[in-house]
Amino acid sequence: PGVEKIEYNLEDTDGIPAKGGQPPVVNIFYSSRWVEKSEDSQGDDKVLYETRGVLYHELTHAYQLEPQGIGGYKPGTEFWVFIEGMADAVRYHNGFFPVDSRKPGGHWMDGYRTTGFFLEWLTGKDPDFLRKFNKSALEIVPWSFDKAMKHIFGEQVTTDSLWEEYQAFLKK
């Protein structure tokens, strides 16, 4: 996407960080109240670590593609899982989730960290996986996880078979 400007807004509100707008101008919102509470309980280093992680996540949203032909952003859908899983995969890939927070269980459709850790694990099978996965959102219509995995890894794989392999890896 043609992002020309990113506006970062630190606001005196409750709430979670979020990306707003569409290219060419994207906004990232962050709560100063959350920063204050976190600093009191965690100290400066942990707040800085978390803030950088949030920025990686939200900046990923600014640049990532959106799956075509499957509706829009709604929790529990493959569209939502793609969007939030990809953002957490990039965050983890860049060192802003501790590896010990990656646990067996859940489902690849859980989104956020669970999906993000799974997607990042797939970079061990193909170092260019995250880029290819993002690009698949334009190349496959209608898009689905299974179609994307087959597109990247070959017709013999399914998302479920890769998930089972990932779960076995986590249990080692």
Could you describe each region identified by the protein language model?
Residues 33-55, 69-79:
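Short pre-active-site segment immediately N-terminal to the catalytic Zn-binding motif
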Residues 1-29, 33:
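Auxiliary, metal-adjacent structural segments of Zn-dependent hydrolase domains
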Residues 115-118, 122-172:
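Pan-zinc metallopeptidase signature
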Residues 13-16, 34-37, 62, 69-70, ...:
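Solvent-exposed loop/turn segments at secondary-structure junctions
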Residues 20-38, 76-78, 98, 102:
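Lumenal/extracellular "mature" regions of secretory-pathway glycan-modifying transferases
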Residues 1-8, 70-78, 99-104, 129-136:
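Surface-exposed patches in mature extracellular/periplasmic domains of secreted proteins
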Residues 53-66, 84-88:
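Active-site recognition of the HExxH zinc-binding catalytic motif
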Residues 74-116:
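Post-HExxH zinc-binding segment in Zn-dependent metallohydrolases
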